[in-house]
Amino acid sequence: MALVFSGCNMNNTTKGGLIGGAGGGALGAGIGAAIGALINGSSGAKLGAAIGAGVGVAGGTTAGVLIGRKMDKAKKEAEAIANAQVSDAVDQNGYQAVKVTFESGILFQSGKSVLSAAAQSSLNKFATDVLAANPDMNVGIVGYTDNDPWKGKTAEQSVAANQKLSEQRAQAVSNFLQKHGAAANQIQEVVGLGESNPVADNATAAGKQQNRRVEVYLYASDAMIEAAKQGTLQ
């Protein structure tokens, strides 16, 4: 799964047409390495190049528009979920996707991977109202932590512990979503990236809270892409 953030202020339907059409090559060249680096750390340049190439060859204007329309619908559905922060993304094929971020402070107690009651309520609604309603969308789940050290552990051990915690939290979210509406084959990838890719300054408590998060990506499955190319995607 290769996903990048999009900074455009147009809806996914419009962006889908631009990305799927002839303009994709230029857009891909502009966003690939720079944004990919934010996602994948030191290997972001390679990831970004792949993303950039994908944006340039996405399956045509019509397919991009149809997929963008589906993503707009899913985005609105996700925006109705409590504690969910929703934004746009672009998948490895250059099609529009949706990124949903849940702060781990809402999902979990500090240092734990057991979902809180409030988290279960939000994720249950997300599973039933968004994932189950869009079975032709693939899902990728990525867990992160802040860089707080663990008591009694060395710096290296703390990094490893945070990595493991991020994996456990991502898996906890995946397991819950599958039990409450998401199909098992809908969730394509579940990974933890530990302390990497902070979105805020770890020097402040507020920044640490933002960095403790689980991101859920919704992106077009092969079946959705094929239907879009055939013009039959509803």
Task: Give the label of every model feature segment.
Residues 145-227, 232-234:
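Periplasmic OmpA-like peptidoglycan-binding domain that tethers envelope proteins to the cell wall
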